């Protein structure tokens, strides 16, 4: 007869599962923010803007091509061919699901040929956004775990040493203590001299941990080019500090916007589409405010102030 599998989960297993959930929560949320940072205007109907942005953030670039058979297409793939004196590849090998092709890349206006395409880069380094978001999600999840541990430590600040003979009596005494009994009566046989009580006195540092988590959150918002100055007591910042923070955020956002605008210019020159791309401030700002509101409720604050 097969032995029954032990379904008991250790505290380490439970904590690991909880940490994984927090990691995926933050990772998916940050990815969702990144995927809708930019709004594309005048894209051909056959090009899905959601697929376009996901591919750019995931792989660092995507191909844009007008196929003679199916029309305009955004395609995943690999940069190929030879690299010129400006370190730009001259070909793109498309390898999307259901589409395989290799086409020359349009890099310079004075070197235009038929059946060329354009590579849309995520940034000047042509690298993905996701590794950084994974790192930030891990930091946020770890801090969330530590906060949960510190909160849980506040629930059992007293340890009472007991044995099989006096455990029930001590539980009854503690229940009276918890019930704010003015007088606690015990049996005369109870050995009070050997009664050992240990106070764990776990320090409450949730507020400090939340401040650190907000600092990490602000860092990732700056990384994505999203305003974040008012998440932590913006009224304490002088105008020069706010302006400096806004300049840093704008510079971070331009890392991604610049590469997309350059691709728009090339596509417009090559195909005459007059594409435009811009930062989607309204939706991103609403998502950020929603996240801020959820965090304020979770730590018992409104408008950044602690409720007394």
UniProtKB/Swiss-Prot annotation:
One of its GO terms (cellular component) is viral capsid. GO terms for molecular function: RNA binding. It comes from the Viruses. Keywords: Capsid protein, Late protein, RNA-binding, Viral capsid assembly, Viral genome ejection through host cell envelope, Viral genome packaging, Viral penetration into host cytoplasm, Viral release from host cell, Viral short tail ejection system, Virion, Virus entry into host cell. It is found in: Virion. GO terms for biological process: symbiont genome ejection through host cell envelope, short tail mechanism. Its main location: virion. InterPro entries: Gp10, Gp10_sf. Homododecamer. Forms the portal vertex of the capsid. This portal plays critical roles in head assembly, genome packaging, neck/tail attachment, and genome ejection. The portal protein multimerizes as a single ring-shaped homododecamer arranged around a central channel. Binds to the packaging RNA (pRNA) and ATPase gp16 motor. This is Portal protein.
């Amino acid at each position: 007869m097969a032995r029954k599998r032990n379904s008991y989960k250790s505290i380490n297993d439970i904590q690991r599962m909880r940490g994984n959930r927090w990691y995926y929560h933050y990772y998916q949320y940050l990815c969702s923010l990144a995927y809708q940072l930019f709004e594309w205007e005048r894209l051909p109907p056959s090009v899905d803007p959601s697929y376009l942005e996901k591919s750019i953030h995931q792989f660092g670039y995507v191909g844009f091509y007008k196929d003679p058979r199916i029309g305009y297409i955004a395609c995943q793939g690999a940069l190929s061919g030879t690299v010129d004196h400006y370190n730009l590849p001259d070909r793109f090998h498309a390898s999307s699901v259901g589409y395989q092709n290799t086409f020359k890349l349009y890099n310079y206006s004075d070197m235009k040929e038929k059946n060329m395409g354009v590579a849309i880069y995520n940034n000047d380094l042509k690298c993905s956004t996701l590794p950084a978001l994974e790192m930030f999600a891990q930091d946020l999840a770890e801090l969330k775990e530590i906060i949960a541990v510190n909160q849980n430590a506040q629930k059992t600040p007293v340890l009472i040493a007991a044995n099989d003979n006096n455990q029930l009596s001590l539980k009854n005494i503690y229940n009276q203590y918890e019930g704010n009994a003015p007088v606690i009566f015990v049996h005369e046989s109870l050995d009070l001299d050997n009664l050992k009580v240990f106070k764990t006195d776990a320090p409450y540092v949730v507020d400090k941990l939340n401040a650190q988590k907000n600092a990490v959150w602000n860092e990732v918002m700056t990384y994505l080019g999203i305003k974040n100055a008012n998440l932590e007591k913006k009224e304490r910042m002088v105008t020069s500090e706010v302006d400096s923070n806004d300049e840093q955020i704008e510079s971070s956002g331009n890392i991604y916007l610049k590469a997309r605008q350059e691709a728009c210019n090339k596509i417009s020159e090559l195909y005459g589409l007059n594409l435009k791309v811009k930062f989607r401030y309204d939706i991103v700002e609403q998502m950020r405010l929603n996240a801020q509101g959820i965090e304020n409720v979770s730590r018992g604050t409104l408008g950044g102030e602690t409720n007394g």
